[in-house]
A protein has these predicted regions:
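FAD-binding core of flavoproteins
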Residues: 1-68, 72, 82, 177-182, ...
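Conserved catalytic-core motifs characterized by acidic clusters
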Residues: 32-48, 73-87, 147-163
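DHp/HisKA dimerization-phosphoacceptor four-helix bundle of two-component histidine kinases
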Residues: 58, 89-99, 129-136
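C-terminal helix-coil-helix/basic helical segment that borders enzyme active sites and/or dimer interfaces
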Residues: 71, 75-82, 98-133, 146-154
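Residue-level recognition of specific faces of alpha-helices
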Residues: 86, 93, 100, 126, ...
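Glycine-rich phosphate/cofactor-binding loops in nucleotide/flavin-utilizing enzymes
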Residues: 149-190
Length: 190
């Protein structure tokens, strides 16, 4: 209800609430100012790093769910008299997914512990690494799961397609994967 503020909803593939905000001669009274003058960028970055960690953790959960559903499917689905998961090609893909999930979890846990240990520090590189790894991995694991499940992976009945839709936007929110790579690179002086 602020004068000069207009909000326009955007329909999205995943059904998530996304809006455009328009500010036209919008006045913010002193009582509504958040933080101290001149510290807006630092506050914004702290918020973005928190958002990145939340997205990383959320997508790690989505990836684990997709992995679990895929694993159950390849154990149950039979071809040529045995579970499809017993074939080397799928077994190796499952092994790679499991390994990457564990690596992502270790990174996520390590960054979260570091943030807890030093609350005032921004941890831009580390938060970007966790967000990049966990969101890209979630997208990869859901696509792999969908592929291994064949037509069932695409069907709404099994839920893999819904998991995939949630992963697509995660690589955009909080800064795209390319932005995360740029942030990480800059922290190494590049």
């Amino acid at each position: 209800d602020a004068e000069g503020l207009q909000i326009r909803g955007i329909d999205t593939m995943g059904g998530k609430d996304v809006n455009d905000l328009y500010f036209t001669n919008c006045f913010v009274p002193d009582s509504a100012v958040v933080g101290k003058p001149g510290e807006g960028w630092r506050q914004l970055m702290a918020g973005l790093n928190l958002e990145r960690m939340i997205l990383a953790a959320l997508m790690q959960g989505v990836a684990r769910r997709a992995f679990s559903d895929t694993l159950a499917y390849v154990r149950e689905r039979e071809q040529f008299g045995r579970p499809v998961g017993s074939f080397q090609a799928l077994k190796h893909r499952i092994a790679d997914m499991a390994t990457e999930l564990e690596c992502a979890q270790l990174l996520l846990d390590d960054v979260a512990a570091a943030i807890d240990a030093e609350p005032g520090r921004l941890f831009a590189r580390e938060a970007s690494m966790a967000k990049l790894k966990c969101t890209e991995l979630a997208k990869h694991v859901t696509l792999e799961g969908m592929q291994m499940m064949g037509g069932y992976g695409y069907a709404t009945e099994y839920g893999m397609e819904a998991l995939l839709r949630s992963t697509v936007v995660s690589t955009v929110y909080g800064g795209t994967s390319e932005i995360q790579r740029d942030i990480i690179g800059k922290t190494y002086g590049l």
